[in-house]
Amino acid sequence: MGEEDTKVIVEPTANGTSSLQKTSDAISGKEVQENASGKEVQESKKEEDTGLEKMEIDDEGKQHEGESETGDKEVEVTEEEKKDVGEDKEQPEADKMDEDTDDKNLKADDGVSGVATEEDAVMKESVESADNKDAENPEGEQEKESKEEKLEGGKANGNEEGDTEEKLVGGDKGDDVDEAEKVENVDEDDKEEALKEKNEAELAEEEETNKGEEVKEANKEDDVEADTKVAEPEVEDKKTESKDENEDKEEEKEDEKEESMDDKEDEKEESNDDDKEDEKEESNDDKEDKKEDIKKSNKRGKGKTEKTRGKTKSDEEKKDIEPKTPFFSDRPVRERKSVERLVAVVDKDSSREFHVEKGKGTPLKDIPNVAYKVSRKKSDEVFKQLHTILFGGKRVKATQLKAHILRFSGYKWQGDEEKAKLKVKEKFEKINKEKLLEFCDLFDISVAKATTKKEDIVTKLVEFLEKPHATTDVLVNEKEKGVKRKRTPKKSSPAAGSSSSKRSAKSQKKTEEATRTNKKSVAHSDDESEEEKEDDEEEEKEQEVEEEEEENENGIPDKSEDEAPQLSESEENVESEEESEEETKKKKRGSRTSSDKKESAGKSRSKKTAVPTKSSPPKKATQKRSAGKRKKSDDDSDTSPKASSKRKKTEKPAKEQAAAPLKSVSKEKPVIGKRGGKGKDKNKEPSDEELKTAIIDILKGVDFNTATFTDILKRLDAKFNISLASKKSSIKRMIQDELTKLADEAEDEEGEEEDAEHEEEEEKEKAKGSGGGEEVKA
């Protein structure tokens, strides 16, 4: 009987499987398997206890009806568990885990389930016998109901005992089979006694617990059956939720990794592609990926409870609300508004913007006289006033005034011409007459300063500025040059000798002009007859007056009219230029001419009476200058007694030479008079050989300290009674050749003398020679 009572509850269900097996179907994972095995052991113990109690009730005849009712209720519980398991079959992962657990449970429960199947028939027979006794014992029914309530309460409290059951799982697995064997071997009598004692204690405890449970059940909306249904799936749901959450976290991590990889790829694509269309396509792809992820998460979370679903939804909503902030966002970025800032506009230079409009006339820079006068003028006030009249009150730098004025080519009237002309006239009328005359001079407008009125000047200026043009063909440059030529002094030969050094600089600049005038004078010399003679007489008078004035200044008495030889203007200009050329050549010779001067001085002393020399006054002036120079050079160089004795020797012959020409003045007068009377007659010109012989004779008796090229020409003219101005160039060459010959001879003689003299004396003589050269140049 004991074996039959323990096997009553392990009744097969409608599907042919035990109820113990079906409760584990809803549990997934190793933990669920362990909990299920622990529960089965406890239930088996409780069923054994209830079996003993039922044996006592069988004696009374009413116990089997309660057991049948409990069996029906267990069947209902198993059916409900099947439904829950059917819902969970949708999850492939949970099913796999359940299959693994089922295999393990089958291995552990083979002995128990096998015993249960063999004894099902015995249980049915005992139930039928018990049904007959239930009608006789109504009190037993009440006891059965109370026991059933206890069992249900025990099942409800199964969750509370779950923690303790988990601890006992490891040790209970192996003990299940042993306990089943012990139950079979225990005597029925011993079991009945032990069960009675236990049942009495348990009944008292169960009554107390049932009272508290009944109060709880009253407050609940559903029955105890609903509570049992909810309690078990809640535990299962919590476990599944924890697993699902872990799985979701892992999946989210993987998704985040994938998203990070995708973001990196997207960043590379964005760096390469800046177009908005690509950005939009990428954003659409990202949205589709998010939707797919949401769908997958929804599929995964179908087995989850409403709480987990609410959590996931809230998390997803937060993710949607909180925008991502990667380095390069996938979404299209709005265009930034450009910031408008106030910037101070810098005005460009007015000089760069200044523009001169073209007029009807020619630009002032193309009119030569106007351009020349504007360039020579230096007063800025005149140009400022002109600039305001021509271009208005525009500010311009002082350096650019002339440039703008020279670019002016006439007024370009805008609007009414008459009004514009009136404005210009008003501007001119405000200016003084003197300034207006300056404007006329600038623009080369001829105006009579005394007679013309201010109004007439203004009208002329306005007419000219309307259409500028050249008023005259004569150039101002050439006029000024001609005036400068006329201003050069017309002096006689002695005056030219004294002032040749002053005119040397000016004469060098005008060598080209002089050669031109020389050619013209030579060409026209044959054609000129009486007119030239009359001009010569007038010029001679003027020259005589100038000579007298110069002589009075130098302290020399006046001379008669016959003393001064006279030449034309062209000849004098040519002579002065040739003198300057001779002086430059004599400077190059230097020491050569010094020796010649000494020899020629000795020769001239012996031949004073034979050859007539130059007039006395210029000689005295030059001698005084040379004496002064010699004194200065001697004082600077040496103060020895030898030098002083030599100076005295050299000064004595100079004084004698100065006295000799004074005596010969009376002798020269008839010669010059004859030349003046005969010069008008045309005689044959001498040949070159005759000229050479005459030049040699003249050079032998000439004092090189005072003589000049004009003096030699005058002597040649006096000798041949002809003006030799046409042959100046040939005469000049002859004189130069003779001078070089004399210089060479003098050098040879000096070389012989230098051997005899000491080196100190040679240096002094060279110093004297250099002083003599300077005198000749002067």
UniProtKB/Swiss-Prot annotation:
Motif mapping: Nuclear localization signal 3: 618-625
DNA-binding region: 703-717, 732-736
Pfam families, sorted: DEK_C
Sequence motif Nuclear localization signal 2, location on chain: 489-496
Subcellular location: Nucleus; Nucleus, Nucleolus
Coiled coil region boundaries: 191-300, 526-587, 732-766
Basic and acidic residues bias (residue ranges): 40-95, 121-153, 165-185, 209-243, 287-296, 303-323, 678-689, 764-778
SUPFAM superfamilies: DEK C-terminal domain
Cellular component terms (Gene Ontology): mitochondrion; nucleolus; plastid
Chain positions of motif Nuclear localization signal 1: 289-296
Record region (Disordered): 1-334, 475-689, 741-778
InterPro entries: DEK, DEK_C
One GO BP: chromatin organization
Claim: Coiled coil is one of the keywords in the record: yes
Keyword Transcription regulation: yes
Subunit structure: Interacts with DEK3.
Summary of the function given for this chain in its UniProt record: Chromatin-associated protein which contributes to the modulation of chromatin structure (such as super-helical structure of DNA) and function. Binds to chromatin of protein-coding genes throughout the genome to regulate nucleosome occupancy and chromatin accessibility, and to modulate the expression of target genes.
Protein name per its UniProtKB record: DEK domain-containing chromatin-associated protein 4
Organism lineage: Eukaryota, Viridiplantae, Streptophyta, Embryophyta, Tracheophyta
Gene assigned in the entry: DEK4
